[in-house]
Amino acid sequence: MNDQTLPPDYLEFAEELADAAAKVTLTYFRLPLEVENKEAERFDPVTLADKGAERAMRDLIAQRFPSHGVLGEEEENIAGEEPWTWVLDPVDGTRSFISGIPLWGTLIALNDGTRPALGVMDQPFTRERFIGDGSTASLNGRPIQTRACRNLADATLMVTSPEHFQQPPYSDLFSKLSSEVRLVRYSGDCYAYCMLALGLVDIVLDPGLKPYDIQALMPIIQGAGGVVTRWDGGDAQNGGDVIACGDPRLHAQILELMQSS
């Protein structure tokens, strides 16, 4: 299908979803909290904040737009009767959340059947709300843009965790990039991508993302002038190994490096 025009009330509704999630997450943040592990082979935490925030958003979607689909991290996917699908990550950065560190956020995307047409990253503790539609991006209503950075030597690189880059070929790539950039920082999750859109970070690199990890961030970064793709240069909306760059020239340079390594 072709891209659809985004109805104006959809942005307002996306912000209502963010408000509903915030009421849940702020109830639990920096308080004693039971943590479950979703996987046997590694620590993949989930809390009542994750589950409750997603449930609150799903309830609102079911009431207001029952024909829309829902793709979320904590519950089963719902196929819609229309092309529109809400893509939800109630707490992106749960490890930071349970550690009391405000490098987490609620991710809300609206996919029109072709692409994420709207993205919201809400950090209710710091009262920051990033919004993008692929053409424009804002922080709390103020327009934002990425910064120019053509060369690796001038770049700030962020990755969620160094443990993701311990084995080849990931280790080889990370060794190459980290040795050439000016600065490397860790543990940003969705917050790192928004700092890229704000013009404070130049590269964010993550392997093995899910659609709900990246779809909300794509319209924000693209609206601020940046680029988000898979490591092979393909569409990142379905997740996988993802790279985001604030400067398209730097993105092209890194893709070439990846393909040659």
Residue ranges of model-derived segments:
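Short strand-turn-strand beta-turns centered on an Asx-Gly dipeptide
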Residues: 113, 140-142
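Generic detector of well-ordered alpha-helical packing
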Residues: 51, 55, 74, 90-93, ...
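N-terminal subdomain of lithium-sensitive/metallo-dependent phosphomonoesterases centered on the IMPase/IPPase/PAP
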Residues: 1-91, 256
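An extended, acidic
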Residues: 145-261
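Small-residue (primarily alanine) positions within well-ordered alpha-helices
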Residues: 14, 18-21, 119, 217, ...
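DPxDG-like acidic metal-binding loop motif
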Residues: 80-135, 155
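Residue-level signal for inorganic ion chemistry
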Residues: 25, 50, 61, 94, ...
